[in-house]
Amino acid sequence: MTVTVRFAPSPTGRIHIGNARTALFNWLFALNNKGRFIQRFDDTDIGRSKQEFADAILYDLHWLGIFPDATEYQSRRFEVYDAAVERLKAAGVLYACYETPEELDLRRKVRRTRGLPPVYGREALALTHEQVAEYQADGRRPHWRFLLPNFTGDPLQPERTEVHWKDLVRGEETVDLASLSDPVLVREDGTYLYTLPSVVDDIEMGVSHVIRGDDHVTNTGVQIALFKALGTEPPVFGHHNLLTTVSGEGLSKRTGALSIESLREDGIEPMAVASLAVLVGTSENVAAAHDLTELAGHFDPAATSKSSAKFDPDELFVLNRVLMHHMPFDEARDRLMVLGISGEQAEPFWLAVRGNLDRLADAVGWWRILREGPQDRPEFSDDDRDFLGQAFEVLPEEPWNGTVWKDWTGKIREATGRKGKGLFMPLRLALTGLPSGPELADLLPLMGREGTLARRP
């Protein structure tokens, strides 16, 4: 059997870090099992779903390193769902209901006052032909519910019916179908809710493993029953913990600051996002992986905590710095070129400055300093100005080699008697305009003698 997973968001907005966690869990699981990854858009809500969001989601996934084996749209598969509806009706497990939302709300309140669970009481099953005709004459159109198999003889007398499955993440799980309402599969206007298309597509597309957030645990009992009603054994399920903000709030597509788009625009590397999204809330230490293949080696669904995990954006910047500090020039070259950093000096420049970068785009500032000199001229005391005058007088002649910084500072020490911070800080300020930064031993050869002398205060 080929392992087949799917990531199935609704294209009603940009995806956030929590959505990315689900996509990455599926991708890494497929990677570890030589399986297939299907990108499926649950776009049956025609009014809210937009192709531009679907395209944006695919762009975000590609940026993360996820390249689906197939892309499917539920909005193009209504005939398949219609056929499944007819099968369920023929089997007597999909029934018409005519209650209005107000009537359903009133019934829930009545059940609560009687100490009963606020689930649907299947009153529609007891409707007479006359009552149905009257509803239809009044212009009411039915919605359709799936009859859960939680009874022995009389569906109006549900009894405890446990559905069990071994969850990839959570271990043994149980849902009592008697505690649930029969789910509405088809609305009054004939459109589909999430449940039926999802199950039908999982069957039709050969999905072997469904990995998603643990807010779907209760849904799983219903879906297992629906799989069986359609004559198919259910897939293996895995429900990972959800990410929250640092303050404990749930993430949503309106959590703009944590959208993949905003993180990308903020200069965060895709592997910083992927590493934190996958490893936070697991027994693994959070560390920056170089690529998804390396990250897959640290991925085990069973190592995921059952408790929600807080996603701290500050941790992203820590991981981002690690990735910057170790990024080979070959990986950075094309992106640096877009920023205007190219030529013979590009590689030694990158190797000199990468250890001081939070984001790759920060290299632009150091490139300007290298090419143009300090962007803000520092102020010096009279003593430091005199010291710098002497220092620039003993600047070695070219050609320079890798020891020029050591040679120069040795001469400065002999000429001025200064050492330590008193020697190095005025030089750093004169050469770069900043009190800290890359090793001057690496920058000085890139400045050249003429460029260095031009920085003399």
From Swiss-Prot:
Superkingdom to which the source organism belongs: Bacteria
Binding site for ATP: K253
Cellular compartments annotated: Cytoplasm
Motif 'KMSKS' region: where in chain: 250-254
Predominant location category: cytoplasm
GO molecular function, one term: ATP binding
Keyword Iron annotated: no
Any Pfam family matching the protein: tRNA-synt_1c
GO biological process, one term: glutamyl-tRNA aminoacylation
Keyword Glycosyltransferase among UniProt keywords: no
Motif extent ('HIGH' region): 9-19
Protein keywords: Aminoacyl-tRNA synthetase, ATP-binding, Cytoplasm, Ligase, Nucleotide-binding, Protein biosynthesis
Reaction catalysis annotation: tRNA(Glu) + L-glutamate + ATP = L-glutamyl-tRNA(Glu) + AMP + diphosphate
EC number: 6.1.1.17
Catalytic EC class: ligase
GO cellular component, one term: cytoplasm
Subunit structure: Monomer.
Purpose of the protein: Catalyzes the attachment of glutamate to tRNA(Glu) in a two-step reaction: glutamate is first activated by ATP to form Glu-AMP and then transferred to the acceptor end of tRNA(Glu).
Annotated family: Belongs to the class-I aminoacyl-tRNA synthetase family. Glutamate--tRNA ligase type 1 subfamily.
Protein name according to UniProt: Glutamate--tRNA ligase 2
Gene designation per UniProt: gltX2
